[in-house]
Each structure stands twice: as structure tokens, then as C-alpha cells.
Regions:
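Conserved glycine-rich
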Residues: 209-210
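Short beta-strand/loop element within the Bergerat-fold HATPase_c
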Residues: 143-155
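Conserved catalytic submotifs in the C-terminal HATPase_c
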Residues: 80-83, 102, 107-117
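Short helix-loop "hinge" at the ATP-lid/N-box region of the Bergerat-fold HATPase_c
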Residues: 136-137
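Short alpha-helical segment of the dimerization/phosphotransfer core of two-component systems
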Residues: 53-61
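Short conserved segment of the HATPase_c
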Residues: 168-182
Length: 240
């Protein structure tokens, strides 16, 4: 019980800090503008762009937090399980993310080794994989690549998201699925990272009784490996 209370206090403290940071930045920028009698148009536009970015960041943090809270309260009987063509879903995800990849000069590749149909919550699975691919794009390098691979056997389907990005230090790997953890806070701020995307992805995958692993080499890239059962069986019905 003490550990739970401590964990809750740490989470609330982190939430408070993360929500205050963009507001503090907006306040500083606004105060700076108001203290100037004659603001050059270019400087005004620059400050307003920064304020807009901070508002977007605050909004993203709130949306991610609401999603996590909703998932924490979601029981298995509230999962909208249906048969989904995973190949088609991955194609849609990459199609939506191509404009972001193009801006970062990152190539997106989908390799479907076989056709896969599985029992999943379509919306939640799409969210999890989108977070993984979007991270791979954001933390990549110029002229980099993200390869998404889909395979399956008789029991599970497997998704790998591999990038040629900046990589993750070994001592950070065990923490990357923690809420609000960011390897490079400066880079996360630059690309709009909230430190919640991977926590959401892991939560979704675990709700499907799956697992997610990560391998990374600094300066070479990162690979996230996901394994999810083809047939969803509620835990109360699963055999011990």
C-alpha cells in the first residue's frame, strides 16, 4: 500500500510538472512581448509561433493523460474486440504518417511477410502502433529509415518497428516505458514528445495479452518488437 501511495504521489508530481512547463514558457514569452514598446514583426511572429507550439504541447499532454486514465479504468469486457486485417491497418497507419516522415526526410517501409487477421481492439492497436512508428520518425536522422515488419505463426502475430535513428543508451532501456520518461529531454521538447507515447503503447499491448521488447544501439537505431495472440481470450476464460 505504501508503494502504491508513493507511486501515485510521483505520478501526480510528474503530471503537475509536465503541465506547468508549457504554461511557464507561454508566460515568459507573453511577458517579453508585453514589455516591448515596438516589437519587430519578425520577432512577434517568432514569439507567437513559440506560444502556439507550447499550446499544442500542452494539449497533447492532456490528451495523452486522458487516454492513460481511460485505459487504466478499462475492464477487459469493455474491449471492442473484432477480427481485423492487420496488414490493412498497418498500411493505413503508414499512410497517415507519411507526411510527417516526409518533413523529416525519413523513408517509411512496410514489409508484410504474410496476411494476418487477428482478434484485436482496432482503435487501441492502431494507437499503439502509431505511437511506435511516430517515435521512430521523430527520433530518426535526416535521410533515415523506418521499417515496419509484420509476420505471424499459428498462435501469434509479430510486428517490428526498426529505425536508423539516434538510439537509446543501455541504462535508459529499462525506463523507456515509464510514464513521462524521456531519454533526451531537449530533443523530446523539440519534436513535441510528451513521454507518454510508449507507456500508452505498452498498456494497449498488455491489454491484448501481448508483450513488447526493445533493442537499441546508440547512433545506429532502435527496434521495438511486439507479439500479440491471434485469438483474444479474456483472462477469466484463459486456462491457468
Amino acid at each position: 500500500l505504501k508503494a502504491v501511495d508513493q507511486s501515485r504521489e510521483e505520478f501526480v508530481s510528474n503530471v503537475s510538472h509536465e503541465l506547468k512547463t508549457p504554461i511557464t514558457s507561454i508566460r515568459v514569452l507573453a511577458d517579453s512581448l508585453m514589455s516591448m514598446d515596438d516589437v519587430p514583426v519578425e520577432l512577434y511572429r517568432e514569439f507567437m509561433t513559440d506560444i502556439s507550439d507550447e499550446i499544442d504541447r500542452e494539449n497533447q499532454i492532456i490528451e495523452d493523460l486522458l487516454m492513460l486514465v481511460k485505459m487504466d479504468k478499462t475492464a477487459e469486457d469493455q474491449m471492442n474486440i473484432e477480427q481485423v486485417n492487420i496488414n490493412g491497418e498497418l498500411e493505413l497507419i503508414l499512410k497517415r504518417l507519411r507526411p510527417i516522415a516526409k518533413r523529416g526526410n525519413v523513408e517509411l517501409i512496410l514489409e508484410s511477410i504474410r496476411e494476418v487477421t487477428a482478434d484485436v481492439d482496432k482503435v487501441k492497436i492502431s494507437l499503439a502502433i502509431t505511437n511506435l512508428v511516430e517515435n521512430a520518425i521523430k527520433y530518426n536522422r535526416d535521410s533515415g529509415m523506418v521499417r515496419v515488419t509484420l509476420d505471424a505463426d499459428h498462435k501469434y502475430f509479430y510486428i517490428k518497428v526498426a529505425d536508423t535513428g539516434i538510439g537509446i543508451p543501455e541504462d535508459a532501456l529499462e525506463h523507456i516505458f515509464e510514464r513521462f520518461f524521456r531519454v533526451d529531454k531537449a530533443r523530446s521538447r523539440e519534436v513535441g514528445g510528451t513521454g507518454l507515447g510508449l507507456a500508452i503503447a505498452k498498456n494497449v499491448i498488455q491489454m491484448h495479452h501481448g508483450i513488447i521488447d526493445v533493442e537499441s544501439t546508440v547512433g545506429e537505431g532502435t527496434t521495438f518488437s511486439v507479439r500479440i495472440p491471434l485469438n483474444y481470450v479474456p483472462r477469466q476464460e484463459a486456462k491457468p
